[in-house]
Amino acid sequence: MAATASAGVPATVSEKQEFYQLLKNLINPSCMVRRQAEEIYENIPGLCKTTFLLDAVRNRRAGYEVRQMAAALLRRLLSSGFEEVYPNLPADVQRDVKIELILAVKLETHASMRKKLCDIFAVLARNLIDEDGTNHWPEGLKFLIDSIYSKNVVLWEVALHVFWHFPGIFGTQERHDLDIIKRLLDQCIQDQEHPAIRTLSARAAAAFVLANENNIALFKDFADLLPGILQAVNDSCYQDDDSVLESLVEIADTVPKYLGPYLEDTLQLSLKLCGDSRLSNLQRQLALEVIVTLSETATPMLKKHTNIIAQAVPHILAMMVDLQDDEDWVNADEMEEDDFDSNAVAAESALDRLACGLGGKVVLPMTKEHIMQMLQSPDWKYRHAGLMALSAIGEGCHQQMESILDETVNSVLLFLQDPHPRVRAAACTTLGQMATDFAPNFQKKFHETVIAALLRTMENQGNQRVQSHAASALIIFIEDCPKSLLVLYVDSMVKNLHSVLVIKLQELIRNGTKLALEQLVTTIASVADTIEEKFVPYYDIFMPSLKHIVELAVQKELKLLRGKTIECISHIGLAVGKEKFMQDASNVMQLLLKTQSDLNNMEDDDPQTSYMVSAWARMCKILGKDFQQYLPLVIEPLIKTASAKPDVALLDTQDVENMSDDDGWQFVNLGDQQSFGIKTSGLEAKATACQMLVYYAKELREGFVEYTEQVVKLMVPLLKFYFHDNVRVAAAESMPFLLECARIRGPEYLAQMWQFICDPLIKAIGTEPDTDVLSEIMNSFAKSIEVMGDGCLNDEHLEELGGILKAKLEGHFKNQELRQVKRQEENYDQQVEMSLQDEDECDVYILTKVSDILHSLFSTYKEKILPWFEQLLPLIVNLICSSRPWPDRQWGLCIFDDIIEHCSPTSFKYVEYFRWPMLLNMRDNNPEVRQAAAYGLGVMAQFGGDDYRSLCSEAVPLLVKVIKCANSKTKKNVIATENCISAIGKILKFKPNCVNVDEVLPHWLSWLPLHEDKEEAIQTLSFLCDLIESNHPVVIGPNNSNLPKIISIIAEGKINETINYEDPCAKRLANVVRQVQTSEDLWLECVSQLDDEQQEALQELLNFA
């Protein structure tokens, strides 16, 4: 359009008419007309847009549809485009916009348009409050306050709508104007003449409380609004409006404490609405959501009202029965997604969450009898719902259901023969869920009955949907089934799977049906993955059929089957190994290459993509360096997938409501009626592709060198990819492997890559919000330091790292204090304690990663790092105080162990910090702490120098006491005990003047061999070699009397896989055996005391060392 009006120059009539026509074109049914109009609109300057749109909104002669479009565009312009447009408007235009907007809101007579103007008003007000809370539109706030004090109901509605849309509109004045806010909300929520006012005031009150979620004092002041809010919830639901109920759900989720004074009323109302079949499904589900959400966010409060929860359970179960008699279900060839809008699915999810929230002690007694009655019903819907209820409560009622698991499983197994296919499918689903919830005990206890029953169900050719569910349950069962148990059934299982495969393959060829076949190939893959080399005898049975499926499945609707079959082939190849797989390797690689070529020309969301990415990685593992020739064909699409950028948007809540659930977007409410959205399709594929790049860098090393620059430039920015945790994990994991690859190209290239990686990696440690991802980042940083070595961090890096680690340690102590406070609160119970323990485990895990980073620094920098470390010293000393929890003491001692091992003799200057903690913790009840202390005493002897002599002398009796303890060799204690034995060996070897060697040596020899701690075991064997090679009389014994014992120690070392042929110690031990063999009598005496396994172990040692 020609419109070019500028500041101070009014638009001409023709320009306005052109713009109105443009607005009409934007709502034209013709796609082409709309697209042209959108292009013209986008090119109009922001000033012109603002003035034209505001004029159009106010012009009642323009027509409602045009005004509506103008309002939507102006709201969007002042929302997402505010920073680009409004600050660049001349001051007089900004003033005019604010004045015109107040007038427009005040004078508008059309109710719907007035709401849209209020939306625009709220958006502008939100953007005119700065970060300090200062309101730069005082006239707008004055208008709002005047509206509150007026007697005009329309102006009340305006004030409420703006306040609901932007509850922070008062800014810094809020504290002083709380009475005004409360007056507005109170007078409107009591208004019996105007239901719309009452509803809107309840929503505004909820929005205000949510906006002040951390202001506990405000909850008390505004608590007397709650009865009005609850009444508005009730009334609005029966007027077909669920908006206030949605607000109540938000309160339950974010500020449950606000509901405290009226919690029983809230629960009773929710129970009533949930059970009222006159209401819509959504309203009933929202009412149930209030109860379920409170079970998660206010568990202790809700446990005081278990009588209401007990009344809710029948309602939940009744909703689970709300199923349709769908005749097409039996013949469907697609496994449809759960309909989360249905009562049955929503109620099943609610029961699951309720059980997890309140625990089995509360929920199981409430549900058990109801479920048993449902399972006995003649109506299939009740039997189906009863089974799905059992499936839902398993995780939350885990501990309580263990004692009744036998009867429960036996009951569920009966329903695999139910006359109704939906019930049989539900029984399969329940068994699969139990296999997850009760693993691995479920597999160990029920393998015989469950495997046989699921295989029989798969053999039943009457219904492929049921077959598919049975196959899915078997896959889940196999995931946690020990290999030793699964191999017991492998013959019958293979026979069954192969016979079904043959039939399903024929059905695919004849009818194109694929559903059961998709699950079947995944089941075969799971079996191969679990039994590994035991699958070799069955390889030739399956591989031809699987390759045939890949060749056949070329149509679009068979892509998922093709992808799953490719995955299955790669799993089988990995299971049977390169030697067996090589007969088909070339053929399989050609199939993969053909699929890869097709994928390069297909949509980004092709279902084969993720399967292909994983399959290539397995082929790499199978073929090793032989895979290198295929890498150029694989890497480009992989990098393309890993580089994909997700669509993101910042939208008003109203825009979000207009978007379809099928658009693939997920939104997070940011408050103030704004939501952040991300299109999630493709994120999983991106994460998988990133993981595969890590894998190739790790496995191929020199074969990956030429791609390192491209990949590192991709991965480093992904450390801040907050849309998907696994992408950040992969980015972190890749760093040390990429550095290893870069080292092959030379030190200069390596240094350049480290310079690119180091700073973002350190910053990520400080900013990463997720504990699991943070641990991976910290682990990656520690490994990277070990790759780079001494001097890899400059002063700025060390300063930043020191600050971050200090903050992590201080946060660790602060979190422990907060947990102790929670343990003193009124609502503290076993459930709260479990939650606190989970938090503590997360904190301790991060502490272990702090220890890993310090270990890498001490091991590379040695004593040069100690001046930097001293800023952390008080915090590490605090960890080993006797009052600290045992994991703190364990990891604090480990850090000092590293200092002693890598920074001696300088480490002695810290001895007064750790001397007594090291000695006293030898008596600790926790074996992990004893192990850390014993290891420290051992490295003192080995690396500490003469200064540590007296401490080593003091340590010996303490170490001996632990070793001689009656339960020292139990599974729980053995690692700590073996570290004590190793420590005594180190004192004997490196500090012999601290102890009576001849007195201690016979005891030390009697404690050998070590079985569990391989690293310490090889050190003890090395010292034993020293003693034998020097013909130490105490070790050899009078008349060689100790040699049979020594030979048995060596044999056990081989059996326990302590002896590694690459270790020089292996050759020395073999030489000891050969030396004994030179005396036939002595050798026969030694051998006579060995069993067959020990003799075979010695022979193997002699053959290879």
Swiss-Prot record:
This is Ran-binding protein 6. Residues 806-842 form a coiled coil. The modification N-acetylalanine is found at A2. It is found in: Cytoplasm; Nucleus. May function in nuclear protein import as nuclear transport receptor. It comes from the Eukaryota. It comes from Homo sapiens (Human). The keyword DNA damage does not apply. GO terms for molecular function: nuclear import signal receptor activity; nuclear localization sequence binding. Residues 333-383 are annotated as: Ran-GTP binding. Belongs to the importin beta family. HEAT repeats lie at residues 219-257, 361-399, 402-440, 444-483, 866-905, 908-946, 949-987. GO terms for biological process: protein import into nucleus. GO terms for cellular component: cytoplasm; mitochondrion; nucleus; synapse. Pfam families: HEAT (PF02985), HEAT_EZ (PF13513), Importin_rep_4 (PF18808), Importin_rep_6 (PF18829). Keywords: Acetylation, Coiled coil, Cytoplasm, Nucleus, Protein transport, Repeat, Transport. InterPro entries: ARM-like (IPR011989), ARM-type_fold (IPR016024), HEAT (IPR000357), Importin_beta (IPR040122), Importin_rep_4 (IPR041653), Importin_rep_6 (IPR041389). The keyword Acetylation applies. Transmembrane segments: none annotated. The gene is RANBP6.
